[in-house]
Design a protein with these regions (language model features):
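Short, conserved beta-strand element in jelly-roll/cupin
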Residues: 49-53, 62-81, 119-123
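Conserved short histidine dyad/triad with adjacent acidic residue
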Residues: 33, 48-63, 97, 101
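Structural motif
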Residues: 69, 76-78, 85, 103, ...
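Short histidine-centered beta-strand/loop micro-motifs
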Residues: 37-39, 58-63, 105-108
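Ligand-binding loop in jelly-roll beta-barrel domains
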Residues: 98-126
Length: 154
């Protein structure tokens, strides 16, 4: 193996068009929908595949340490940001910077299933804020995960 290769992915790949969801990530926020982490992923870069039926959503949130790239694979989800709402098209890609400016929600207001991929750098530890829920999560690559209530500004 060449010396400049730091990480070699071993094991099966994943087909983003496959309808077999296998093990799913639990949604604690109430938005519903399906999520699964993608294999392969590296020590720094990761991705998650999401699927939303009508009425499901990925709750409004932003990451303090990492930026994200969303690519719509199927359907026409509604994107909510600090600038308002708009419908995304299949194949459209949207970047969300780290911090409050990157706050976003993805929602399915249509009768068609929505599928999208979110990729980003894995920052550890990471804090994610959910302004509508007045909560924040803390997480690390070592298995730490907690949900914390965020108090109103005085």
């Amino acid at each position: 193996m060449p010396e400049d290769v730091l990480f070699v992915c071993k094991g099966p790949g994943m087909n983003i068009w496959d309808d077999d969801w296998g093990t799913q990530v639990e949604d604690w926020s109430g938005g519903g929908g399906l999520a699964k982490g993608l294999v392969p992923s590296g020590p720094q870069l990761g991705a998650t595949l999401y699927e939303l039926e009508r009425g499901n959503f990925m709750v409004f949130h932003f990451h303090h340490g990492s930026e994200e790239l969303l690519v719509v694979l199927r359907g026409r989800p509604t994107l909510r940001t600090l600038d308002g709402e708009r419908q995304l098209d299949e194949g459209e890609a949207v970047h969300f910077p780290a911090g409050p400016a990157g706050a976003h929600e993805i929602r399915n207001d249509t009768d068609e299933t929505v599928r999208y991929l979110v990729a980003g750098i894995r920052v550890s530890p990471e804090i994610v804020e959910y302004p509508d829920l007045k909560k924040a999560t803390g997480q690390s690559k070592h298995g730490l995960f907690f949900i914390h209530d965020v108090e109103e500004d005085a």
